[in-house]
């Protein structure tokens, strides 16, 4: 679980720990409810294979009657240096199979995503090992600060909206 590919889970676990809430095992994943300023934020960690996470995303959007514009998908991104954050309104899957599956099942590329840079500091042919590998010492030292910013992003998205969140946090 402590791998670069699981940064989304790590961010959600950080928020849950910070807020004193816990995840419950439910259909297709684990869910925690964060109540903040009169709003309820549903945190979802799909338990499908990452490359099939669209199944859980689609199920929970439909079950909770959430518009795709009101969800924020967190994804690792090899094309961004470690810890770099990009929040986007829409886009391609960027070669990420989890996003590819979400887009297939939602029949759309138009949903907000939060891209967390994990860098591409691996040797040729070592991408899978790198992505599924644990954080190195230097990354671990910087991770807590990046998790704190990530937590603020999730809360800002829910309370201030996508555009305000993008303006405040993109590039930080």
Positions of the model-derived regions?
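Nucleotide and nucleotide-moiety/phosphate-recognizing core
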Residues: 1-89, 100-114, 121-126, 133, ...
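Short glycine/threonine-rich catalytic loop with a Thr-x-Gly-x-Asp
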Residues: 92
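Hydrophobic alpha-helical segments within soluble ligand-binding/sensing domains
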Residues: 95-98
């Amino acid at each position: 679980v402590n791998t670069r590919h699981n940064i989304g889970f790590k961010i959600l676990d950080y928020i849950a720990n910070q807020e004193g809430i816990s995840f419950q095992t439910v259909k297709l994943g684990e869910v925690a409810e964060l109540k903040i300023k009169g709003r309820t934020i549903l945190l979802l960690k799909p338990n499908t294979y990452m490359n099939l996470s669209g199944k859980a995303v689609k199920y929970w959007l439909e079950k909770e009657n959430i518009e795709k514009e009101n969800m924020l998908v967190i994804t690792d991104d090899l094309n961004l240096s470690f810890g770099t954050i990009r929040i986007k309104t829409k886009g391609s899957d960027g070669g990420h199979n989890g996003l590819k599956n979400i887009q297939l099942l939602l029949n759309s590329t138009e949903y907000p995503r939060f891209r967390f840079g994990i860098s591409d500091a691996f040797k040729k042919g070592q991408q899978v090992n790198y992505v599924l590998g644990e954080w190195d010492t230097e990354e671990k030292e910087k991770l807590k600060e990046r998790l704190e910013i990530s937590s603020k992003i999730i809360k800002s998205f829910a309370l201030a909206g996508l555009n305000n969140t993008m303006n405040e946090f993109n590039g930080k």
